[in-house]
């Protein structure tokens, strides 16, 4: 809608890209509704009022305005490292527009502004658990919401592994270095590259 004032009643004529079924003006403020417009920037719309004596007003130039009915598109860029021991993990997603971020599910963050680019946010402190319900949505400056982005499931685990059994046992005798295998059992699955050993006589 658009409001303008006229000092006489008359017939409204529209110019440029805008039109309306509201074609009668009163002496005073008039609020009209433009016919449907496509998403775009409009700077050429004009309004003229012609009175009963066929005298035309000046052509009123409507201030430039933007019609935007399309929400941003958001997508995951870098998932949360899983499993991980960071209770405030970072997450990167992309947005096609600037806007305000809202969070859903178990996750939240103090990062609430999105750029039209990649965005890295830090989730607020999370407990040890697996999270598969976290969502992110970006709403642009026109109030259009993005698609709902489901964050890939991740696990936070802060308890270090323990050794549950060792062969040979401590101080065990009659062990052959050449034929006996040394085995260690841990309380959980291990990253082999992170396991180190020390040997001493």
Language-model features, listed with the residues they occupy:
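Surface-exposed, short loops/turns at beta-strand junctions within beta-sandwich domains
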Residues: 33-43, 122-132
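Short, exposed coil/turn segments at beta-strand boundaries within extracellular/luminal domains
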Residues: 53-59, 142-148
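Flexible, low-complexity linkers/stalks enriched in Thr/Pro that connect modular domains
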Residues: 61-72, 150-164
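Short, surface-exposed alpha-helix to beta-strand junction/turn motifs within ectodomains of secreted
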Residues: 2-3, 9-22, 90-92, 98-111, ...
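Aromatic sugar-binding surface patches on proteins
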Residues: 24-33, 113-122
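Short, solvent-exposed loop/linker segments at the N-terminal edge
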Residues: 81-87, 172-178
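Short, conserved beta-strand segments of beta-strand-rich sandwich/propeller modules, principally
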Residues: 43-46, 90, 132-135
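Conserved structural position at the C-terminal beta-strand
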Residues: 49-51, 138-140
């Amino acid at each position: 809608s658009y409001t303008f004032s006229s000092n006489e009643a008359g017939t409204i004529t529209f110019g440029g890209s805008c039109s309306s079924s509201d074609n009668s003006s009163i002496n005073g403020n008039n609020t009209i509704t433009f016919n449907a417009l496509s998403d775009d920037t409009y700077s050429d719309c004009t309004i003229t009022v012609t009175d009963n004596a066929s005298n035309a007003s000046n052509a009123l130039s409507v201030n430039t305005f933007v019609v935007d009915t399309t929400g941003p598109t958001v997508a995951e860029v870098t998932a949360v490292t899983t499993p991980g021991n960071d209770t405030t993990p970072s997450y990167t997603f992309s947005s096609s527009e600037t806007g305000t971020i809202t969070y859903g599910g178990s996750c939240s963050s103090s990062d609430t502004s999105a750029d039209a680019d990649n965005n890295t946010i830090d989730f607020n402190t999370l407990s040890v658990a697996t999270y598969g319900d976290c969502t992110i949505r970006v709403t642009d400056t026109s109030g259009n919401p993005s698609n709902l982005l489901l964050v890939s499931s991740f696990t936070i685990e802060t308890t270090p592994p323990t050794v549950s059994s060792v062969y040979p046992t401590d101080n065990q005798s009659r062990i052959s270095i050449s034929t006996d295998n040394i085995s260690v059992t841990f309380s959980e699955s291990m990253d082999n590259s992170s396991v180190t050993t020390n040997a001493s006589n």
